[in-house]
Curated annotation (Swiss-Prot):
Species the sequence originates in: Macaca mulatta
Location of the region described as V (Cys-rich) in the Swiss-Prot/TrEMBL record: 19-104
Keywords: Secreted
Protein known as: Neurexophilin-1
One Pfam family, short name: Neurexophilin
Region of interest called III, as start-end residue ranges on this chain: 1-9
């Protein structure tokens, strides 16, 4: 989301969970990795200058115990110049030999 774009959600969606083991979702973090890379590139505002650019890529996976009712969650990433909101939904087929077909 560009820094000039305002992102708003309903109050029900603004729940923030900081703990790695969340009892409310009955889930726990299984894997977490953050990769960072830096490089010098031409500045967007002045191509005659060189700007420092840093990129961050995050990977996370979690396991949930049944019964769980997590449909989708929203994860927010903040920086000084941007806010990224990612909608994440569980992969019901990950540990299953038979495909998951939602009903209803």
């Amino acid at each position: 989301v560009p820094p000039t774009k305002i992102v708003e959600f309903d109050l029900a969606q603004q729940t923030v969970i900081d703990a790695k083991d969340s009892k409310s979702f009955n889930c726990r973090i299984e894997y977490e990795k953050v990769d960072k890379a830096t490089k010098n590139t031409l500045c967007n505002y002045d191509p005659s200058k060189t700007c420092y650019q840093e990129q961050t890529q995050s990977h996370v996976s979690w396991l949930c115990s049944k019964p769980f009712k997590v449909i989708c969650i929203y994860i927010s990433f903040y920086s000084t110049d941007y806010k990224l909101v990612q909608k994440v939904c569980p992969d019901y087929n990950y540990h299953s030999d038979t495909p998951y077909f939602p009903s209803g």
